[in-house]
Swiss-Prot record:
SS bond list: 33-47, 41-61, 63-72
Chief place where the protein resides: secreted
Species in which this protein is naturally found: Rabbit fibroma virus (strain Kasza) (RFV)
Protein name according to UniProt: Growth factor
GO CC terms in record: extracellular region
SUPFAM superfamilies named among the record's database cross-references: EGF/Laminin (SSF57196)
Organism placement in taxonomy: Viruses, Varidnaviria, Bamfordvirae, Nucleocytoviricota, Pokkesviricetes
């Protein structure tokens, strides 16, 4: 779960601090998943990978509206 929180924080920084060196560092390390993770995200979620160190590649999902969970496996029926 800590990895997911780190990824969420990094993505927030990526969008909020787009003109700083931190943004460039993050963009270099976040990529759309390759075929190894083709079916990793469920319900049409988009898979990305992030290199957390020189060796580890961690996949994560960005879910479509009304879906949530680490792999977009849960439907969120709450409407706002």
């Amino acid at each position: 779960m800590a990895t997911r929180n780190l990824v969420a924080s990094l993505l927030c920084i990526m969008y909020a601090v787009h003109a700083m060196n931190d943004y460039l560092y993050i963009v270099k390390h976040v990529k759309v998943c390759n075929h190894d993770y083709e079916n990793y995200c469920l319900n049409n979620g988009t898979c990305f990978t992030i290199a957390l160190d020189n060796v580890s590649i961690t996949p994560f999902c960005v879910c479509r509206i009304n879906y949530e969970g680490s792999r977009c496996q849960f439907i969120n029926l709450v409407t706002y």
